[in-house]
Curated annotation (Swiss-Prot):
Post-translational modifications: Phosphorylated by GSK-beta (GSK3B), promoting recognition by FBXO3, leading to its ubiquitination by the SCF(FBXO3) complex. Ubiquitinated at Lys-201 by the SCF(FBXO3) complex in response to lipopolysaccharide (LPS), leading to its degradation by the proteasome.
Protein name: F-box/LRR-repeat protein 2
Encoding gene (name): FBXL2
N-terminal signal peptide: none
UniProt motif (CAAX motif) ranges: 420-423
Pfam families given in the database record: F-box-like, LRR_6
Modified residues (Phosphothreonine): 404
Gene3D superfamilies membership: 1.20.1280.50, Ribonuclease Inhibitor
Positions annotated as LRR repeat: 61-87, 88-113, 114-139, 140-165, 166-191, 192-217, 218-243, 244-269, 270-295, 296-321, 322-350, 351-375, 376-401
Lineage: Eukaryota, Metazoa, Chordata, Craniata, Vertebrata
Length: 423
């Protein structure tokens, strides 16, 4: 919309400044910047710090340099509560020091992928940003234990911290962190490959409010560490153990006996887990909603039977590469409360014993939205077609190898690839 000078002047006369500011508060960054170009009056209103409490620069990441962050911090000052610099690789320590000095009321800061920053940034946040509650340092690979020591001393209100792929972090950094930040509710440590069981012992001792913990690819973790977490963090609702290949049923037993509120469990590639462990888990964790059991190669239909009986809230289940699962297990799942009412996503890639019979059973899952069937060699196009006639809204992803074409005759038309079919 384009305003003439008369239109803009009329709006300014009819509406008080306070109401215009309120209207501007609902606009995104781009629209605010456009409004700032209308007139001097609107420039002042649009760039008022109260309109810039939440800023996400992800869409402009390639253009954001340090001076942009510095200018924003000077403009917003104490108004700014939430800033996302995700992917802004041009932003470094110096700019974030200026930001921290100017925006001392910041509560939510996303620095995911800001690879230039070092411990110096965390020192600045510790010194000036005591109200910080949410901090994402994903892939800030220069971050060390010194950062965690600084954060623990100055950011004691922290509730969410993402340190994924900060692979210099060790148990000493975790100990320093949790001693100061005892109110942590979510701690994401994906790819922190130096962490061992002792780090989890420190978390157990101090983080009793913890609700979400991600240990994906922390390959040194064993049952001992998971048992300690379970004994100290009874409020745990989401736990990712994918890629922790040393774990056995002892970890599932500890979860079942200590964490009844568990809703999300990711245990992909934990190939030592068996039906016995999942049986105990299912019988005690009735709130489970999402489970990733990809490549839990020892589980059988017995696990599905227990989940069907005891986990009525299950919405998403990955069984990819669980090659012992059969149509009978899918029958129990489909006939259960979760199958009838809750199940939305089911992944059965490379479940070689699954046939079209399983698809007939899944017709009972009226809420099913997505079904993965890649490399299920006994599933046919006809079977999928019959199921989709009953569940037309479901998205089925499958792959069928192309039929070997006859030898081409010289001069024949162009051959077409018909193997990649998404149904």
């Amino acid at each position: 919309m384009v305003f003439s000078n008369n239109d803009e002047g009329l709006i300014n006369k009819k509406l008080p400044k306070e109401l215009l500011l309120r209207i501007f508060s609902f606009l995104d960054i781009v629209t605010l910047c456009r409004c700032a170009q209308i007139s001097k009056a609107w420039n002042i209103l649009a760039l008022d710090g109260s309109n810039w409490q939440r800023i996400d620069l992800f869409n402009f990441q390639t253009d954001v340099e340090g001076r942009v962050v510095e200018n924003i911090s000077k403009r917003c000052g104490g108004f700014l509560r939430k800033l996302s610099l995700r992917g802004c690789i041009g932003v470094g320590d110096s700019s974030l020091k200026t930001f921290a000095q100017n925006c001392r009321n910041i509560e939510h800061l996303n620095l995911n992928g800001c690879t230039k920053i070092t411990d110096s940034t965390c020192y600045s946040l510790s010194r000036f940003c005591s109200k910080l509650k949410h901090l994402d340092l994903t892939s800030c690979v220069s971050i060390t234990n010194s950062s965690l020591k600084g954060i623990s001393e100055g950011c004691r209100n922290l509730e969410y911290l993402n340190l994924s792929w900060c692979d210099q972090i060790t148990k000493d950094g975790i100990e320093a962190l949790v001693r100061g930040c005892r109110g942590l509710k979510a701690l994401l440590l994906r790819g922190c490959t130096q962490l061992e069981d002792e780090a989890l012992k420190h978390i157990q001792n101090y983080c009793h409010e913890l609700v979400s913990l991600n240990l994906q690819s922390c390959s040194r973790i064993t049952d001992e560490g998971v048992v300690q977490i379970c004994r100290g963090c009874h409020r745990l609702q989401a736990l990712c153990l994918s890629g922790c290949s040393n774990l056995t049923d002892a970890s599932l037993t500890a979860l079942g006996l200590n964490c009844p509120r568990l809703q999300i469990l990711e245990a992909a590639r934990c190939s030592h887990l068996t039906d016995a462990g999942f049986t105990l888990l299912a019988r005690n964790c009735h709130e489970l909603e999402k489970m990733d059991l990809e490549e839990c190669i020892l589980i059988t239909d017995s696990t599905l039977i227990q989940l069907s009986i005891h986990c009525p809230k299950l919405q998403a289940l990955s069984l990819s590469h669980c090659e012992l699962i059969t149509d009978d297990g899918i029958l129990h799942l489909s006939n259960s409360t979760c199958g009838h009412e809750r199940l939305r996503v089911l992944e059965l890639d490379n479940c070689l014993l699954i046939t079209d019979v399983a698809l007939e059973h899944l017709e009972n899952c009226r809420g099913l939205e997505r079904l993965e069937l890649y490399d299920c060699q006994q599933v046919t196009r006809a079977g999928i077609k019959r199921m989709r006639a009953q569940l037309p809204h479901v998205k089925v992803h499958a792959y069928f190898a192309p039929v070997t074409p006859p030898t081409a005759v010289a001069g024949s038309g162009q051959r077409l690839c018909r193997c990649c079919v998404i149904l």
